[in-house]
Amino acid sequence: YAIDLTSEGQNGVATGIFVNGKDVYASGWYEEGKVKIPFFWKNGQLLRLFSKAENAVTSKIFVSGNDVYVLGNETIYDPVTSHPVSTGVYWKNGNEILLTNDKEGSQANSLFVSGTDVYVVGFRGSFEKIKHGYWINGDFVPLYDSMNCTGLDDIFIVK
């Protein structure tokens, strides 16, 4: 399968790939002007992911059974300060799931699905205090606080 990263003259970026049987999935995003729009491809067919944010990018894709999970990060703007806030997000079968508590930003770095459990690793917090950890089914589990360059970048579940 081929993926056209210049569809309709736009610049595109492929960010992840997953093979499930005979199906090939890829995550990515297109840039339309200054706006980044998330997509994924299945067997070369482009499928748009809808986001409430002005800018959203993808980073990973995972398939479990018939469910397609695409991980990414969005930029939303604080309604009080108008400052940009990064928010981790994943889409399950095209439905957007935000990884935030509406009080602080977050970043999603990797995703793994085991049975019905969805694990996402990353961090949440503000510039003053970052909590590294993971989400399981949307609930954040902090592992440590750090303002250093240390981070969590991948997750796997072994049973």
What are the functions of these language-model segments?
Residues 1-159:
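Residue-level hotspots at or immediately adjacent to binding/recognition sites across diverse folds
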